[in-house]
UniProtKB/Swiss-Prot annotation:
Belongs to the TRAFAC class translation factor GTPase superfamily. Classic translation factor GTPase family. LepA subfamily. Required for accurate and efficient protein synthesis under certain stress conditions. May act as a fidelity factor of the translation reaction, by catalyzing a one-codon backward translocation of tRNAs on improperly translocated ribosomes. Back-translocation proceeds from a post-translocation (POST) complex to a pre-translocation (PRE) complex, thus giving elongation factor G a second chance to translocate the tRNAs correctly. Binds to ribosomes in a GTP-dependent manner. Pfam families: EFG_C (PF00679), GTP_EFTU (PF00009), GTP_EFTU_D2 (PF03144), LepA_C (PF06421). It is a peripheral membrane protein. The gene is lepA. This is Elongation factor 4. Residues 2-183 form the tr-type G domain. It comes from Wolinella succinogenes (strain ATCC 29543 / DSM 1740 / CCUG 13145 / JCM 31913 / LMG 7466 / NCTC 11488 / FDC 602W) (Vibrio succinogenes). It is an enzyme of class 3 (hydrolase). It catalyses: GTP + H2O = GDP + phosphate + H(+).
């Protein structure tokens, strides 16, 4: 056990985490040179295309140092803000972490957030300055930033280039010297932390565990503590980047994959504790909460007959991603679908893309919303996440909305842009400090509803991509809010309703109807598009009707004949307008997301 090192890599997006993992794997000789490919740890196509890590992967490496063989377990963590729950699980199964910072970019908002999780878990942190071969690299400045913003001593920081492999050997030696070996009791009853789980078509649900005390053997009966269910261990494997390697036992301090032959992942929830069924441990490993959805949106199949396929697809994705929550809902405009809870915007995009890609579905997503707490006039309290379920205004005594604490790091020349943008979104400044002469850290309390739409994109475009952003949910605060409905041809389209601050309802409504006017296809009758709050119409646009030339078949002839046909057409249009239905294209539902 003294020769085991469990560590993970903490980094902001694009600071070179997956490349560094590739280099460590290569240096330890775990993968032959001919099998080596970029982003070896990122297994999903979406991960490779977007260059992000979503699922935490792990790999077991062997390394020789001063004549002894060591086992290094590298636990990869996602860097994006939505997946911080994956980070907290991965970090809880390590003793140390490499803090990777780009030598040209410096400290970013996400880096700070993840370092705090690591410090909470009392990990030994090794600062690593990556990309030092870039012309713009400034390792001294970056070390000062780390010391100033995080308070870590950087005198022993390592300089590496993951791309060229510079300094990788020294890094491995340092990992063995500075990261402590696991401390667990080998003779105690089995106690293991499940820090990831996924579904394999042949083996069923698999749990990736870190054994804290005791060991897990093939054939042993284990108990999952939160569900109280017992399962038999069918197989055990060590994770390896190309194919897992079978083993008979996973010992104290090691990580491994446990095969239980289960049909679904909900029985082995991430963050749960596994123990021996005959002699269970007294208490579970603490510090884990089930992932809470942060953003909700409706997902509907474009072809309503495929509702059951969507249900199956969501069930299968849930096997891999225990954080998705969903329940069926119906919409007048879109038919049958599901209300799905996500961890954040990127998570929502990734899930939608995976549903469309892996299950070949065409989906419409409604505008994302958050959970509101309402106190009604009769004193009762309710929570609402779908705007169309909001009770009438006269029944609501007060309405509270969730807030987040956002940390934004931005170059000082864009400071004005960012402050203007955040205050337009009802942000309240809590703190502002200069990291160095060119970069500023801002801390704001912002209503969650204001950041779920396109806050991140707007922040990036307003700062030429230089700002970084991270958030954590804080509390509910009272807000003066109203439901904005969109009516097309007199009918409310429930899927387009959004909840907005009252003082902004007019401009939001106006922007929405203008956007919709461009999108709604012209009909044979004119279509009114209106925005309303309660029963009051606050904005309107009209889509003009298409003229059909009914007099085309009259060659010459009497004017009264033509007039008769035109009158008849007018009557028909009137009737059509009264009963006509307007088919809304997919873009109409996205228009809600685009208004600022």
């Amino acid at each position: 056990m003294k020769n085991i090192r469990n560590f993970s890599i903490i980094a902001h997006i694009d600071h070179g985490k997956s490349t560094l993992a590739d280099r460590l794997i290569q240096e330890c000789g775990a993968v032959e040179a001919r099998d080596m490919k970029a982003q070896l740890m990122d297994t999903m196509d979406i991960e490779k295309e977007r260059g992000i890590t979503i699922k935490a992967q792990s790999v077991r490496l062997s390394y020789r140092y001063e004549g002894e063989d060591y086992i290094l377990n590298l636990i990869d963590t996602p860097g994006h803000v939505d997946f911080s729950y994956e980070v907290s699980r991965s970090l809880a199964s390590c003793e140390g972490a490499l803090l990777v910072v780009d030598a040209s970019q410096g400290v970013e908002a996400q880096t700070i957030a993840n370092v705090y999780i690591a410090l909470d878990n009392e990990l030994e942190i090794l600062p690593v300055i990556n990309k030092i071969d870039l012309p713009a690299a400034d390792p001294l400045r970056v070390k000062q930033e780390i010391e100033q913003t995080i308070g870590l001593d950087c005198s022993g920081a390592l300089h590496v280039s993951a791309k060229s492999g510079l300094g990788i050997k020294e890094l491995l030696d340092e990992i063995i010297r500075r990261i402590p070996a696991p401390n667990g009791q080998e003779s105690a009853s089995t106690k293991a932390l499940i820090y990831d789980s996924w579904f394999d078509n042949y083996l069923g649900a698999l749990a990736l565990v870190r054994v804290v005390d005791g060991s897990i053997k093939v054939g042993q009966n284990i108990l999952v503590m939160s569900t109280g269910k017992k399962h038999e261990v069918l197989n055990l494997m060590y994770p390896h980047p190309l194919a897992p390697q079978k083993t008979q036992e996973i010992k104290t301090g090691e990580i491994g994959i446990v095969v239980l032959g289960l049909k679904n992942v909900t029985d082995i929830a991430v963050g749960d504790t596994m123990t021996d069924a005959k002699n269970p441990t007294k208490e579970a490993i603490d510090g884990f909460q089930p992932a809470k959805p942060f953003v909700f949106a409706g997902l509907y199949p474009i072809d309503t007959d495929r509702f059951e396929e969507l249900r199956d697809a969501l069930n299968k994705l849930k096997l891999n991603d225990s954080s998705i929550q969903y329940e069926p809902e119906t919409s007048v405009a879109l038919g049958f679908g599901f209300r799905v809870g996500f961890l954040g915007m990127l998570h929502m995009e990734v899930i939608k893309e995976r549903l469309e890609r892996e299950f070949d579905l065409d989906l419409i997503a409604t505008a994302p919303t958050v959970i509101y707490h309402l106190t009604l006039t009769d004193g009762s309290e309710v929570s609402v996440q779908n705007p169309s379920e909001l009770p009438p205004e006269q029944k609501i005594a007060k309405m509270e909305e969730p807030y987040v604490r956002a940390t934004i790091i931005v170059p000082s020349e864009y400071l004005g842009n960012v402050i203007t943008m955040v205050s337009r979104r009802r942000g309240v400044q809590e703190k502002m400090e200069y990291i160095n002469e060119t970069r500023v850290m801002l801390v704001y309390a912002i209503p969650t509803n204001e950041i779920v739409m396109d806050f991140y994109d707007k922040l990036k475009s307003g700062t030429k991509g230089y700002a970084s952003f991270d958030y954590e949910p804080i509390e509910y605060r009272e807000g003066d809010l109203a439901k904005l409905d969109i009516r097309v041809a007199g009918e409310i389209v429930d899927a387009l309703s959004i909840i907005v601050p009252k003082e902004k309802s007019y401009e939001r409504g106006k922007e929405l109807v203008e956007a919709m006017k461009e999108i709604v296809p012209r009909q044979l009758f004119e279509v009114a598009i209106q925005a309303s709050v309660g029963n009051k119409i606050i904005a309107r646009e009209t889509v003009k009707s298409m003229g059909k030339n009914v007099t085309a078949k009259c060659y010459g002839g009497d004017i009264t004949r033509k007039r008769k046909l035109l009158e008849k057409q007018k009557e028909g249009k009137k009737r059509m307008k009264a009963i006509g239905r307007v088919e809304l294209p997919q873009e109409a539902f996205l228009a809600v997301l685009k208004i600022d």
